[in-house]
Amino acid sequence: MKDGQAVFTNLEKCYIYRYIFAKGIESQKKINLKEELINKIPEIDIKKYVCQMLKDKTTNSIYKNNTLRQDKLLWIAREYQKQGIKYVEMTDTDLAKNGEPAIKMLEEIHSIMPLIEKETGVQIRFLIGIRRIPLTIIKDQKTSNTYLRENINVLRAVAKSPYVVGSDFIGEEINDISDLQPAIKEIVRYINEEDKDFTIRIHAGENDSLRNNVRKSIMCVKESLEKEQEMPRCRIGHGLYSEDLNTESGKELLKLMKDTGVVIEFQLTSNVRLNNLTDLSSHPIKRYLANNVNCVQGTDGCGFYGTDCMEEQMALTNLL
């Protein structure tokens, strides 16, 4: 799935149609793909993919009983294999949902991942997606008033899976991250008690509406530490906007980032395409690197934007 070079100006519809709710449903009307029809496909790559998909569904195939999600994971791994990527993390909110969704997803993951790793050599691991705000843009969408507490309770259970390696606070950045302090504190406590390698990722500073969210995200984690507990693995998704880095407050933020060892994850294509970055000269990455802040670049969902690591590296080269 690619969107060419489109810029998404209506973020609400972007959420509805392209991201959260673009969940495939298996068609009841199957296409009878005969060899003569396949040979008429003009695109060589598509023809090759169709042949592989049909092969995956043959009687002797280990993938013949794959669910739609398992097929997606398989093809994601195959694409990463082509790009030379060995390890990838994906966020999924089903892992934070009460009852059947989390259980069903774990069952599917545990069933398919050994087969995927054997074929491709690609390790896919998962972050538990926790929405920073409940969804209200979908008609009849019902969200519990205690959804954050429910998410944390589920997190403690599913985090036992070897395929689950962290948590990720996601969603449109329209609220102060301090609102999530209780949930962050519970995750930090879990890390201290159960799994020191568990990651906390918080999306912050993606737009310029709440410039204190990057600092507050780090402080929410730091202030949640138990006595003598070390700073856990903490990543900030985007970190594009914060207080002015030329001010005393900005310099203190740079020192805080360095001292706590947080990793700032940049996604240039995503920032541009979601209209969050219109002037490349205002990007803070040079200041971060000059102050020894840990930075890493990603695609923020390469399937949606049609980019790969090479294109993102070229964009970064042009920026630097």
Language-model features: locations:
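Metal-cofactor-binding active-site regions of metalloenzymes
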Residues: M1-L320
